Curated annotation (Swiss-Prot):
This is Dihydroxy-acid dehydratase. Functions in the biosynthesis of branched-chain amino acids. Catalyzes the dehydration of (2R,3R)-2,3-dihydroxy-3-methylpentanoate (2,3-dihydroxy-3-methylvalerate) into 2-oxo-3-methylpentanoate (2-oxo-3-methylvalerate) and of (2R)-2,3-dihydroxy-3-methylbutanoate (2,3-dihydroxyisovalerate) into 2-oxo-3-methylbutanoate (2-oxoisovalerate), the penultimate precursor to L-isoleucine and L-valine, respectively. It comes from Rhodopirellula baltica (strain DSM 10527 / NCIMB 13988 / SH1). Homodimer. The keyword Iron-sulfur applies. The lineage of its organism: Bacteria, Pseudomonadati, Planctomycetota, Planctomycetia, Pirellulales.
Length: 567
């Protein structure tokens, strides 16, 4: 059974909701809808599900209930019925460095499942979602792809930067000040002030971290209105965008433009180029693969390497640079960047978008980057001539790994392994000064099944950066790295340790070599020794044996397959 194929007039704007609003046999359905305040006239109107990831406990999401009200007002003004509903969210910033991080990636698929569930059960004709934090965005798009009903994503927007002693702060400042403190570089009073001032209000983490990366990719993909990714959360333009979404979704209904008409192979290509140029998070690899699979578009980790090879890294945005998303909006925003990429022939812009026009048609009517801006370099003088995301393979990652290398760290690293079976052990070693320059830190059993949930390693990378070792230490994991992570880092190593991947066989002192020019990741141990180690290896017990994480362990695919759970 599929809820996406009702028996009704295929040309009607209410072809889904009419399944319950029109038949006399569905009187009970209609009685309950009348109870919500709908009128007899409303029963003939299209119904739009408005899915918000609002919850109070996270700055990224705490304002979404108000934005959902603005979206509903726009839907009502457009002559339709808006029905708000909520789904879950997990704050990566709050759960980072704790066992709570195991629930983060899993929340992406729960969001997709819950949106698909309510849209299918309630028979809404179209969907507008309001995500805030990292996993919210791909969760929304995966649901849209599965449902294939007219859909728009309205990003909750980015946070304003904080400030302390005339320096801009963001969430990564709050992470890194711990490493600075244990290294004796700042006092406890300074550390406390940085923490208090890093997040001054509502909105997602301010740099080109995962939330802004995914919002940017989704705008380039065509599933959000122009400027959605760069308008700050508390800017008046964000409320205006919410209200415009009503008329936009009406046009999609009239033209019967659906996610699978927009999310084409060409759209994913343009999205990948855009995020590479802006220095987006490695998490985009995982999420775009999952989104593509939801619409049956083939996309692999090798495709990211192909795009990276031909796309220069242009944007001086945090975490590797000094600007934040609000700064980018002030010089033209996401559309201005894409307009420049289109002019340079780096994206094609041929795919349909939620405006009912192609991306190129949208950009033709919008201004370019402001003259004299310092955030986005030219293609002729880039920060790096190729992309920062590298797909590595070798004896340590036979099925692939994802590195984030901007060029500031160098392109090769070789050194002795320092192996830790969880991030807590690594942090303890750092505090005890056991990690030295030249080391390759390995944090394993943090993959999709082993973590479980492939937790992010922002706390360890931030601690290393704060301790002044960022240029002298490499870090590898079968877990993920936050969009806020920077340094010489390699994640998404597959096969993961829990299933017996080579990362499980590393011992302290083994030489590991990372080469971002040859895209290789190798464990310098001979095959006979590795085979001897494998014969003694046994998988550790699963960290979850009941409940939602156990279900996730049983269902999740590998990182190279997007960690999807519905195949």
């Amino acid at each position: 059974m599929t809820a996406s194929q009702p028996e009704s007039d295929s040309n009607a704007l209410n072809k889904y909701s009419s399944k319950i609003t029109q038949p006399k046999s569905q009187g009970a359905s209609q009685a309950m809808l009348y109870a919500t305040g709908m009128s007899s006239e409303d029963m003939n109107k299209p119904q739009v599900g408005i899915g918000s990831m609002w919850y109070e406990g996270n700055s990224c999401n705490m304002h979404l209930l108000d934005l959902a009200a603005d979206v509903k007002a726009g839907v009502t003004d457009a002559g339709m019925v808006g029905m708000r509903f909520n789904t879950i969210g997990v704050s990566d910033g709050i759960s980072m460095g704790t066992d709570g991080m195991s629930f983060s990636l899993q929340s992406r698929d729960l969001i997709a499942d819950s949106i698909e569930t309510i849209m299918g059960a309630q028979w809404y004709d179209a969907l507008i979602t309001l995500p805030g934090c990292d996993k919210n965005m791909p969760g929304c798009l995966m649901a849209m792809g599965r449902l294939n009903r007219p859909s728009i994503m309205v990003y909750g927007g980015t946070i304003k930067p904080g400030s302390y002693r005339d320096e801009k702060l963001d969430i990564v400042s709050a992470f890194q000040c711990y490493g600075q403190f244990i290294a004796g570089q700042i006092s406890e009073e300074e550390r406390s002030e940085i923490v208090r001032r890093s997040c001054p209000g509502a909105g997602a983490c301010g740099g080109m971290y995962t939330a802004n990366t995914m919002a940017t990719a989704i705008e380039a993909l065509g599933m959000a209105l122009p400027y959605s990714a760069s308008i700050p959360a508390e800017h008046p333009e964000k409320k205006e965008e919410c209200k415009r979404a009503g008329l936009a979704i009406l046009e999609l209904l009239k033209k019967d433009i659906k996610p699978r008409d927009i999310m084409t192979r060409g759209a994913f290509e343009d999205a990948m180029v855009t995020l590479m140029a802006l220095g987006g998070s490695t998490n985009a690899v995982l999420h775009l693969i999952a989104m593509a699979r939801s619409v049956d578009v083939p996309l692999t980790i090798e495709d990211f390497q192909s795009v990276s090879d031909r796309t220069p890294f242009l944007a001086d945005l945090k975490p590797s640079g000094k600007f934040v998303q609000e700064d980018l909006h002030s010089v033209g925003g996401t559309p201005a960047v894409m307009k420049y990429l289109l002019e340079k022939g780096m994206i094609k812009g041929e795919h349909m978008t939620v405006t009912g026009k192609t991306l190129a048609e949208n950009l033709a009517d919008l201004p370019g980057l402001k003259t004299g801006q310092k955030i986005v370099s030219t293609v002729e003088e880039p920060i790096k001539k190729s992309g920062h995301i590298r797909i590595l393979k070798g004896s340590l990652a036979t099925e692939g790994a994802v590195a984030k290398i901007t060029g500031k760290e160098g392109l090769q690293f070789s050194g002795p392994a320092r192996v830790y079976d969880n991030e807590e052990l690594m942090l303890a070693a750092l505090e005890q000064k056991q990690i030295q320059k030249g080391d390759v830190v390995v944090i394993r059993y943090e993959g999709p099944k082993g973590g479980p949930g492939m937790p992010e390693m922002l706390t360890p990378t931030s601690a290393i950066m704060g301790a002044g070792l960022g240029s002298d230490v490499a870090m590898l994991t079968d877990g993920r790295f936050s969009g806020g992570s920077h340094g010489f880092i390699v994640g998404h190593i597959t096969p993961e340790a829990q299933v017996g991947g080579p990362i499980a066989l590393i011992e302290d002192g083994d030489t590991i070599t990372i080469d971002a020019e040859t895209n290789s990741l190798d464990l310098e141990v001979d095959a006979a020794e590795l085979e001897a180690r494998r014969s003694k290896w046994t998988a550790p017990p699963l960290k979850a044996t009941r409940g939602t994480l156990y279900k996730y362990i049983k269902c999740v695919k590998s990182a190279s397959e997007g960690c999807v759970t519905d195949e």
